[in-house]
UniProtKB/Swiss-Prot annotation:
Keywords: DNA-binding, Germination, Metal-binding, Nucleus, Repeat, Repressor, Transcription, Transcription regulation, Zinc, Zinc-finger. Residues 60-69 have a biased composition (Basic and acidic residues). PANTHER family: UNKEMPT FAMILY MEMBER (PTHR14493), ZINC FINGER CCCH DOMAIN-CONTAINING PROTEIN 2 (PTHR14493:SF90). Residues 20-37 have a biased composition (Low complexity). Specifically expressed in seeds. SMART domains: ZnF_C3H1. Interacts with MARD1/FLZ9 and RD21A. GO terms for cellular component: nucleus. PROSITE patterns: ZF_C3H1. It comes from Arabidopsis thaliana. This is Zinc finger CCCH domain-containing protein 2.
Amino acid sequence: MDVVCTEHQMRKPTVEIPPRKLLLSSKSFPSDSSSPRSPRKHNWNKSNKITSEHEEDNEDNNRENKEYCYDSDSDDPYASDHFRMFEFKIRRCTRSRSHDWTDCPFAHPGEKARRRDPRRFQYSGEVCPEFRRGGDCSRGDDCEFAHGVFECWLHPIRYRTEACKDGKHCKRKVCFFAHSPRQLRVLPPENVSGVSASPSPAAKNPCCLFCSSSPTSTLLGNLSHLSRSPSLSPPMSPANKAAAFSRLRNRAASAVSAAAAAGSMNYKDVLSELVNSLDSMSLAEALQASSSSPVTTPVSAAAAAFASSCGLSNQRLHLQQQQPSSPLQFALSPSTPSYLTNSPQANFFSDDFTPRRRQMNDFTAMTAVRENTNIEDGSCGDPDLGWVNDLLT
């Protein structure tokens, strides 16, 4: 019986059928001449193309270099700023098979790197103190602070706002810092301070935009959206000397804010409104505060000159609105102090108009203003040197 079975197996030998992938690879690619009986091993990639092991190794190396390259955001969509800030470890992973979570840019159940969507949850880029101490927060997703490193440094107000210390030699898969000037993100001032971007009255009125663009403008006043930084503001004088001028500046700022709230006034209307407000206010408080000490006599003189110049500037503004523009308006400076006197303006092309005479008129006008101010303040122009004679005798 055994002999019959052996003969039957010898007549019909068994044949081992290779897998389907090897059959397809052997039909598509002929075997090499060096090894005709050993077909080459091939694998299927995601694009359903047959590649050899050597080509697959090259692709893996290129992919690894691409992931570790510091400037890979230009080619990799998963490395863009928008994906890193709003999708990285937020969107749930849809892959069914098991894989390495550290290499996957999507979120997985129970993963510590999971983040909250900053578009849905309002939290800042600061680390939660409770989460830092115990690794957990009692407020959960309602906490206003960041939980973990990913929420902290991938927040839109912190991601790539600082330079990486390793620079172009950085080998991190996910780096939170910038490696080139092109990657560095510069945030607007309202985002840096944590205030949401909202249309302000300054964005509607071009005059307020011009005023706010100057860091030393006195039209800023106490407006919240036009406030100057402390580093740019000059040192404040004592309160008893500058109280009246601070109120004057607040009055001017309120006039500008009222004109900005209207929205329909142009630059000339805002300027005329500002001059009218300065002309109507009284500087008696400023003169009273400055007359308390003889040292503040120049302050009172400047206040009187400022009041008279505001009134005459207002008159010039009305005359310019009534009369057509002429080349003589631009020949003379509008801020010249010669308008403080009641003398008629000299013609630019006449013989009476000379620089020497103009300087003398300016000096005479300023001397008259200084003498009038000294008389009003009750202070003497000449210093009292009687105590010097007492010391000499």
